[in-house]
Amino acid sequence: MFSIFQQPSAKVLLLAMSIAFMFPTSAYANTAPLTQSEIDRQIQTVPQWQQEGQTITRTFEFKNFVEAIAFVEQLVEPAEAAQHHPDLAISYNKVTVSLTSHDAGGLTAKDFELAQTISQIGGG
């Protein structure tokens, strides 16, 4: 019995489809590193965030540890949806969020988009 998947062209197509499924193009949207002038413009869209080298950071303060952890839990869904994950430092009632695009070697539009979402979750 002859199978279409035994043909080299079919194997290449199947491989390409598998890769496209595993790595959708939306995961790579907005991943070009920004220039410093672009960063300077973008940082204005996320008040209270600070640039530290190739990272942007912001510390959120809450009434207690429980509220701080509840905030962190709210970050899971948007981070997963964006396929972009912040670095988090928790110190009792404070959560410091840091964003960078490691694969791009610096800050990208994705960092600022996620920073806006995180700011909304954190109350502005």
Question: What do the PLM-derived regions correspond to, one by one?
Answer:
Residues 2-14:
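Bacterial N-terminal signal peptides that target proteins for export
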Residues 25-124:
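Conserved, structured core segments of small domains
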Residues 13-24:
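Bacterial N-terminal signal peptides
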